[in-house]
Regions:
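Short acidic/polar, Gly/Pro-enriched loop/turn segments located at secondary-structure boundaries
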Residues: 1-155, 166-182
Length: 182
C-alpha cells in the first residue's frame, strides 16, 4: 500500500524521515541491480536507467536469437521504477525481484515477480500481460494493479486500482476475474 501511495502521488514528493519511538525510518531510495542472463550485473541508479543499461551492456554484433530473461533485484530499503519494452510502467518495491524478457514476442507478455510491484499495463488486447508468481498467475485485462508475492508467504495478494485482472492459483483449473472493490 505504501508503494501504491508513492506511485499515485508521483516520484517528485519530498523525502521525509519519520521518527517513531526513537527509531528513524528512512524513505526507500532508488536502487536496484540488473542481472543479465549471462550473469553480468549492473547497478541501476538515478544515473543509469534500466533502458540505458540494456543498450550499454548488450553484447555487440550478436544476432538476436532466443528471448533472454534479465532480472531486476531491488534490495531491502530500495525501490525502482522502469518502463518495459511494451510501454508498461512498473514500480518494484523493496526486497523484490522482477524477471523480464529482453523483448516481448508471441501471443502474451509475461514477467515473473518475487516480491511486490505496482504495474500500469500498456493496453494490448491481442497480447495479454501475465505476472507469474510462485502462488499463481495474474493475467491483466488492461489495468493498474499491485501484486504482493513475497517468497515464503502462503498467499498472493493483488490490489486493483482500475480495470480487471484474472487470477489463477497454482493447481487451479479455472481463473477468477477480479474488478475493483471485489
Amino acid at each position: 500500500c505504501v508503494g501504491l501511495g508513492y506511485w499515485l502521488l508521483g516520484n517528485d514528493t519530498p523525502q521525509t524521515t519519520f521518527v517513531s519511538g526513537g527509531i528513524s525510518i528512512e524513505p526507500g531510495t532508488t536502487k536496484a541491480v540488473l542481472v543479465f542472463n549471462s550473469g553480468q550485473q549492473v547497478k541501476l541508479t538515478d544515473s543509469i536507467a534500466f533502458e540505458q543499461a540494456i543498450e550499454k551492456f548488450k553484447p555487440s554484433g550478436q544476432v538476436e536469437q532466443a528471448i533472454e530473461y534479465n532480472k531486476i533485484i531491488v534490495p531491502r530499503g530500495g525501490e525502482y521504477n522502469l518502463v518495459l519494452a511494451d510501454g508498461t510502467s512498473v514500480m518494484i518495491n523493496s526486497d523484490s525481484k522482477l524477471s523480464v524478457p529482453d523483448r516481448f514476442e508471441g501471443k502474451e507478455r509475461r514477467v515473473r515477480l518475487e516480491g511486490e510491484a505496482l504495474f500500469h499495463v500498456a493496453q494490448d488486447v491481442e497480447h495479454p500481460f501475465i505476472v507469474e508468481t510462485d502462488g499463481g498467475d495474474v493475467t491483466v485485462l488492461g489495468t493498474v494493479f499491485n501484486v504482493n508475492a513475497y517468497s515464503g508467504e502462503d498467499y498472493v495478494q493483488t490490489t486493483l486500482v482500475e480495470g480487471r485482472v484474472a487470477f489463477q492459483g497454482k493447481g487451479m483449473t479455472d481463473a477468477r476475474t477480479i474488478a475493483p472493490g471485489e
